[in-house]
Swiss-Prot record:
Belongs to the peptidase T1B family. It comes from Emericella nidulans (strain FGSC A4 / ATCC 38163 / CBS 112.46 / NRRL 194 / M139). The keyword Hydrolase applies. This is Proteasome subunit beta inpE. Signal peptide: none annotated. One of its GO terms (biological process) is secondary metabolic process. It is an enzyme of class 3 (hydrolase). Disruption phenotype: Strongly inhibits growth in fellutamide B-producing conditions. Gene3D superfamilies: Glutamine Phosphoribosylpyrophosphate, subunit 1, domain 1.
Amino acid sequence: MAKETRFYPYTSNGGATLGVSGPDFAILAGDTRSTAGYNINTRYEPKVFTIQDARDRSIVISVIGFAADGRALKERLDAIVAMYKYQHGKNIGLRACAQRVSTMLYEKRFFPYQLQTMVAGIDADGQGAIYYYDPAGCIEKRSHCAAGEASSLMLPFLDSQAPRLQPLSLQTAQQLVRDAYTGATERHIEVGDHLQMLVVTREGVSEQLVDLKKD
């Protein structure tokens, strides 16, 4: 009997992303390992990116799932943000950017980006905020969230720890992120190599790169 062959353009490139927000900061983090099944494509494939670096209006995005879709979404958003600044003479705000990403994903709902997406930054009130999206563009504001291969492990960890440590300080949040990824690398082969953290405060965006398990 002949085997039917169907076109399926999507694949998952592994990894995990995580977001934590506090009174005056937001963190998006992702590991840098890219996989295809049991193969490692590369040990440095960023999943978190800065959209703009303007003072007091810094925005970061994380994309995980199909890496090519992630790059396409990020590059398209870069162009939209640049056009907004050209037309209005100012940087786009976090809430407007978050809504625009939702629209971009919804526009592709019949052939969607195979991604779990987060957008984070400092809102107009000076508070840290994280917006989480499904592939069809449904948007939800959260204090913390996780996506990707190890999300089922990391999210319960955050759910149990973050409320107990309120009000959450930046240093405590960074340690929670490191602990979550340290545990994830012990149990998920798709996660590892390096932890990339983008920390957004009123002063702008800072990046940290921490070594993770490499085997």
